């Protein structure tokens, strides 16, 4: 049991460090939880419960920007929250066998989101000019809500791209909106996870504690490493993990 606790703490530490540097904590936490013998869906539920509080401090930091545009953000958030609840309900009622089959695809999506970054925003503005962008944003936010409730790795990058394309606001405002949406999506998704009975509470608490220390370490490292280098490192490791799922 001591060995498992160390792995849980390491998962949180690595996830928190990576999240603070470039994002994508679930790329690393999920495989480490699987390595301890947790079933795939239990591992996904456990990491969802353990990692969702990490979004809340960021929402508080951006509270002034968010309150200034609260009505618009609330309307935009509705489809995302509906999608999040649906994604979480479907996930906790899926079989481990079916979930494992889609994990490589989900990990691949998150890696692509990390690699593309701001270029996704440029593509959206090109693909949906004028009034079509607003409708496309609603559909995409619903889809991202579903993805966030179902799995959620790389969700922050995807939200940042969609919100940047539609907002036309300052980067601080968009970052605040991204954290708000990610926190709201994960909070809604946690409901079905908590009542599912699949949470491993020892693992969840260890990941949460490790994540707090990892977040501090990652923030320190992020000041010294260029954003592009950190993003590339996370993406490369993500590709390795995805390949290991494909060929395992």
Residue ranges and their predicted role:
Residues 86-87, 141-151, 189-197, 204, ...:
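Hydrophobic alpha-helical transmembrane segments in multi-pass integral membrane proteins
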Residues 1-37, 125-175, 182, 205:
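Selected transmembrane alpha-helices and immediately adjacent juxtamembrane segments
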Residues 38-48, 67-75, 168-179:
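Membrane-interface alpha-helices at helix entry/exit sites of multi-pass transporters
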Residues 57-67, 105-129, 242-248:
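Transmembrane helix exit motif
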Residues 26-38, 81-92, 147, 186-191, ...:
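Membrane-embedded alpha-helical segments in integral membrane proteins
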